[in-house]
Structure formats: C-alpha cells, structure tokens
C-alpha cells in the first residue's frame, strides 16, 4: 500500500498509551482483525475496549516504526454483551472496575449501556452500587458522550478536539447550540479563544450570527490586545480607529458598541483628569482594590515604634558596616511607619539596608515573610538575606481552577500568617498579582517593598512601582549614594551612567565590563557563541550552562534569541546518538539543552531536596536531563527541582541559551553576554539597556555597535503605558 494513501480501519482499543487532555493528541493500540496497530493523532477521550472506525494513512516513525496517522475518529458503541463487558472492564465508564463490570453485564446483558444512560436506578440492584454511586456512574457516562456529540456537531465547523472540550467545560451540554448561535461566545472568560479563531468558526456556520455579537467581541478583543501590551486602561477615543479597522465598520458604530458594553458591565468607564478611560472589569477591580488597600494601610498603619539610633549603631557594629544617611532613613521609616518603598540602583546598598530592617523586625519578635515574583528572584533573595523566600504564587498558596486560572488560598478571608512581609523586585509585579498579594495581607501587617524604578515595567499589565512612587502618598526612600566598593565595578559605574543618559565607558581593560566591537550582526552572533562556549569558560572557569547567560534585546534577527539559540545549541549541545531529541514546532529539544518555561503551569509536579511541590513558572530556567522517546516524557532540572513532563508540555518551553531582556528580569547571572546591534527602534531605549546590564554580577560583555549602545543610553523614551493606580491612590471617594 502506498504511503499516505487514505484508508479506513476499524477495531477495538486494546490500550490508550498516551493522551493529552489539552490538545487531544492520543497514542493507542488498536486490535484490528489479527493485527495490533499503533494509531496516533488528535482524538476525543477514549477508553480501552471501545470500538473505533478510523480514517487516515500509514506512516513510519524513526523511533516507533509503522503507525496509523488518524485524521478522523468515529466512535462505535459496543453492542454485544462480550464487547460491553470488555469495554466496562477496561475502565470505559468511571466508577466501574472489572469485577463490577462482570456483575452488571451478567444481570443486564446487551441492555447494559442503555440502563446506565437512561435507567441508572436499576444499577443499585447490584451489590456494591449505592443509589448515589449509580447516579454518578450515569452522570459520568453521559458527560463522556455529551463531549463526543458536541465534537461530532462542531468539528465540521473547523473546531479541534481540544476546542470542543473547552467549549463543553464552559457551556455544558448546550455548547453546540450556543456556538451555532454566537460563536463569539468562545472569546469569553473561561474559554479564551482568539477573536480571529471565532471569526473563522463563524465563517463556517451555515447561518451567519447576529452582527452585534461580532462587534462586541471585536471591541473586547482590542481591549485585550492593549492589556497584553501592558495597559490597564485605554482612552476611549483611541479605541475608535483600531476597532473600526478590525471590524470593517465606522467609528460611530464602534462608539455605540462601547456604550452597549459599558451598559452590560463588560467594560468599565472612568474619567481621569477629564478624559474618559475604558477598563476590562477584572483589571478595573484589581487596580482600584489595590489603591483602596494601600490607602487603608495608610489610614490604619501598623503599630510602629521609635527606632533608636543605638539600635542601628548596634547592627552596624555587629555586621562591620557603616550605613549612609539614606539607608538610616529607610530603616527608621520601616520601623516607625511599617510601610516603605525602598528603591535605588546597583551598588546603593538596598540589600544591606534590607538586612538591617529584617534584623530589627526579628529583634521585635515579628514573624517575617519574604517573597519575590519569580523562582530565581526568590532564590537570590534567600541567598542575600540568609532567610527563606518564596515566590508570590507559592506564598499565596496558589491553586488552579477549571478554566486554568490561578486561585489563591491566601486571601482576605484566609490572610497570610505574617506580621511583616518584604516583597522584592516590585518592578516585575503586574497589577493582578499585586492586587491578590495585598488582599492576603493581614490587618496591621508591615509591608516593605523593594525595587528599581529604572528597570523595565512588568511583562503583565500595569506599572505598579512607578505609579505608587509617582502618587507621592506612600513613603519612599530612594538610595542614590553609590558606595566606594561598588564603584570599583565598571558594571555598576556604567549602569549609573546609562540611567543618567551618559554613554557607558567602553574599552576599559582589566575591569568587569567589556566591549567587543563589530558592525556585522552575523559576526556578532558568532562572537557571542564563541564567548559562551570557549572564551569565558577558559578565562574564568565559568560553566556555559550554569554561569553564563546570553541576553538579547529582541527575539528576531541575527542577534535575536531565536537565531542565537540555534547557533549555541549547535555549538554547546550538537546532535549525538547518545542524546535523544524531539521536535516541537520549529524547535528541537535535545537531552542536555538549556530551557526556559514560558508560562505559569501550576500543575507540574516536582521533587526537590527540601520536599515535593507543584508549579513551574514563567521565566524558570532548567536543563533538559532526559528525553524518553518511548514514554514520550521529558525530565528537566529547574535548579534543584526535578520535573517530569509529557512531550506535549514541551510547547510551554523554549531554548534558553539566549533569553530576552524582558525574560531575564528578576535574575542575576555571574556572567552576561549581550549583543547590541540591529536592535529594533521600538526596543532601543535606555531602560532596556539598563535592565540587561544590571543582570550581570561579575562579568558583562557587550558585543556589537558602539553607536547603537550610545544612542540607547541617550534614548529616555519609554513605551507608554496607560494605567490608573496613581489616579485611584489620589482620588478621594
């Protein structure tokens, strides 16, 4: 039979060896006649013992041999008593095991499935099945086939198995009817389809949906797009042109649609300085509640006390240090007011000041919790304070709801067990996480927030640190004095020069800041790879994987992360028969690769020296230790945490020999290599350069164009972010 000739086969499932519930990818063994066939493809939820009719073609896999690639899967219910027994005994219906299956089929024979579906009370006649269990068995059976019926109804409109499951979870048994009437309901909360995807499905329907659904979904899509760009709100007039273009309509229609959305509560309107701004409701709530909680802390401050000079003198003597005036001011403010934003650049003594505050809190017998946005930032916080620190998510005891959204066990009803909380890397915290964090603070809890306002704003929406400082209502101490020991570092000196808009000193020998000039992006990429693979390890003994990090302004271009990751993978971890690999999209993942998690996944289980846990988060970097082609599982070490994930979860990873500046936030590395050449204009600004430079602890090498480095240092333009936290902090209700 010719390869890729489309055929149909039928048989009984012997075993489902792998199934990904998110995207429906399934590997199963099918008994077809006397042959045991491996079938792979996107299929609905299936159980051993079920009868299938499959359409597809034969293919050959390099590792697993001959396979049947499934393009269409049709389910056939078992009809004979023998087939029904086999189906139930294999776990085809939740709650029925092999022994119970024999009892049920012995009693009801070929009518078994009809009774489970339509007359479940009769199941309670069998010993071991209570009336409650009979109802649950029937409900699970109906749900299983409801999903399949929805798939049959909706797949002809281009919806995938995973999309059908999402629709069922959101809308239940009415999913098909709802989608046929209004496919744009798929864009709503809890489903999460893109507007473009809903448009495609709408185009496949025999009867076009009401245009009002489309208009409202389009406006909300533009709002969500602005949210993904960091804006918590947007001026109303700025919505007209992009919405009109997207929807091929006029601005008056957009204006009317916005009013309808405000009237139905799907948008919120707020006037700020006599200008109307629009919010998505959950972001409006997050920003407003954050401001209200901060104002509550200001109105009813924690019980402070006078900080005696002799106490600070004692800490100085104990630690062999001498605080500057601003450091003393920060310590006094923290002790006396219990609320502080501590900010400052590298070398200004934030860590030393923080440790002084910690010591006085502990001397007062306070229970102190330390937190940071990312795992690496929390680990670094632990290292510099000598005390345990957690990610914000772990501190708040995150859980995962049925729509894959984080829910926190710690909240206003179940606040944190702490009398003081210190939050580091505040510049990285977006407004939704900050709102959840503030909600979990107990009444009277002291709050110390630390961050560098010159760094990039968070990847998520909002500009929390900047807005709180700009409001002027929260106590802020900015450390500006760079201590003599820190000024011996050219990294520190140049970081402060960049912040001031001055060109960094390049070409200074025998320091920790190096520059390698080239005007060729191709040569720059090769130089970066050579520095990481050979020159820095040879000169300083650094590990290319553990100690050196390449940080790029952009993903695209010769010196973007996409290309440099390919170049460095070929150099540091080339193909080898002893290193199994698998391909996901355009990326080859090979045993030994350096990888990064690109989204929060709260379900991944891991084991570590201090116990087990769940959750790997956006920005976590690890090493791919094992790629098991037979089980289709991968083992990754994230620092000291070992996680084993299915191949399908690899789509949440990317190679991390090189990462973007945005992804590097909150991390520090012994050595950083940063190519600066051909940087896109939208990224060629000062705080991006500054953020990249300050990721290096011991060695920094810039590779590329001197003129571009100088122009980035001079460019104080920042991407405009619309946010309202400052407004809500200042407004009097």
Feature map (PLM): residue ranges:
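ASCE P-loop NTPase helicase motor core
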Residues: 233, 328-331, 336-509
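Loop/turn positions that initiate beta-strands
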Residues: 49-51, 592, 619
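Accessory, non-ATPase domains that flank or precede helicase/AAA+ motor cores in DNA-metabolism machines
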Residues: 1-310, 733
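Conserved pre-motif I regulatory segment
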Residues: 311-338
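Conserved helicase motor core of P-loop NTPases
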Residues: 453-614
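C-terminal accessory regions
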Residues: 500, 609, 618-733
């Amino acid at each position: 039979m010719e390869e890729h000739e489309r055929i149909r086969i039928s048989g009984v499932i012997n075993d489902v060896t792998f199934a990904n519930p998110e995207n429906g990818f399934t590997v199963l063994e099918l008994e077809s006649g006397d042959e045991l066939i491996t079938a792979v493809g996107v299929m609905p939820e299936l159980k051993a013992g079920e009868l299938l009719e499959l359409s597809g073609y034969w293919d050959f896999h390099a590792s697993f041999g001959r396979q049947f690639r499934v393009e269409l899967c049709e389910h056939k219910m078992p009809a004979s008593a023998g087939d029904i027994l086999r189906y139930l005994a294999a776990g085809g219906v939740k709650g029925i095991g092999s022994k119970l299956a024999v009892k049920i089929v012995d009693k009801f024979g070929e009518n078994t499935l009809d009774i489970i579906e339509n007359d479940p009370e009769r199941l309670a006649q069998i010993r071991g099945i209570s009336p409650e269990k009979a109802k649950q068995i029937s409900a699970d059976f109906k749900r299983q086939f409801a999903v399949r019926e929805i798939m049959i109804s909706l797949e002809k409109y281009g919806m995938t198995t995973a999309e059908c499951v999402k629709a069922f979870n959101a809308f239940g048994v009415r999913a098909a009817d709802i989608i046929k009437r209004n496919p744009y309901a798929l864009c709503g909360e809890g489903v999460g389809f893109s507007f473009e995807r809903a448009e495609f499905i709408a185009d496949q329907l025999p009867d076009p949906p009401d245009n009002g659904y489309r208009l409202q979904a389009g406006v909300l899509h533009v709002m969500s797009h602005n949210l993904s760009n960091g804006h918590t709100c947007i001026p109303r007039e700025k919505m007209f042109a992009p919405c009109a273009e997207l929807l091929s309509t006029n601005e008056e229609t957009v204006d009317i649609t916005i009013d309808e959305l405000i009237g139905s509560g799907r948008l919120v309107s707020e006037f700020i300085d006599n200008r109307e701004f629009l919010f998505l409701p959950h972001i409006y709530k997050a920003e407003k509640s954050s401001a209200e909680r901060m104002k509550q802390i200001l109105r009813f401050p924690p019980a402070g006390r006078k900080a005696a000079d002799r106490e600070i003198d004692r800490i100085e003597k104990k630690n062999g240090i001498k605080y500057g005036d601003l450091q003393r001011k920060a310590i006094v403010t923290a002790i006396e007011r219990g609320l502080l934003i501590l900010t400052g650049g590298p070398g200004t003594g934030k860590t030393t000041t923080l440790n002084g505050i910690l010591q006085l809190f502990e001397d007062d017998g306070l229970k102190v919790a330390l937190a940071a946005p990312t795992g690496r930032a929390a680990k670094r916080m632990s290292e510099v304070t000598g005390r345990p620190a957690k990610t914000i998510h772990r501190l708040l005891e995150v859980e995962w709801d049925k729509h894959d959204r984080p829910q926190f066990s710690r909240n206003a009803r179940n606040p944190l067990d702490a009398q003081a909380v210190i939050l580091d890397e505040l510049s990285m915290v977006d407004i939704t996480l900050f709102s959840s964090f503030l909600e979990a603070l107990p009444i009277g809890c002291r709050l110390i927030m630390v961050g560098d306002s010159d760094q990039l704003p968070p990847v998520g929406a909002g500009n929390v640190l900047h807005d709180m400082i700009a409001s002027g209502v929260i106590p802020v101490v900015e450390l500006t004095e760079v201590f003599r020991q820190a000024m011996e570092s050219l990294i520190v000196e140049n970081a402060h020069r960049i912040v001031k808009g001055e060109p960094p000193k390049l070409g200074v020998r025998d320091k920790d800041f190096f520059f390698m000039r080239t005007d060729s992006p191709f040569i720059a990429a090769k130089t970066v790879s050579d520095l990481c693979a050979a020159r820095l390890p040879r000169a300083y003994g650094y590990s290319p994987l553990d100690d050196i990090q390449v940080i790029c302004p952009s993903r695209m271009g010769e010196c973007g992360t996409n290309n440099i990751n390919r170049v460095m993978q070929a150099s540091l971890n080339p193909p080898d028969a002893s290193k199994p690999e698998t391909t996901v999209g355009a990326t080859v993942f090979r045993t030994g690769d350096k990888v990064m998690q690109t989204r929060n996944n709260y379900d991944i289980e891991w084991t570590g020296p201090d116990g087990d846990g769940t959750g790997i988060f956006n920005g976590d970097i690890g090493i791919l230790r094992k790629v098991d082609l037979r089980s289709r599982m991968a083992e990754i070490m994230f620092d000291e945490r070992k996680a084993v994930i299915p191949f399908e979860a690899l789509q949440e990873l990317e190679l991390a020999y090189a990462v973007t500046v945005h992804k590097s936030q909150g991390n520090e590395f012994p050595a950083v290599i940063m190519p600066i050449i051909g940087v896109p204009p939208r990224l060629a600004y000062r705080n991006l350069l500054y953020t990249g430079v300050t990721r290096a602890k011991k060695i920094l090498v810039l590779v590329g164009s001197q003129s571009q480095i100088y122009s980035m240092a001079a460019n104080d333009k920042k991407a405009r972010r619309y946010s309202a936290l400052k407004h809500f902090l200042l407004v009097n209700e």
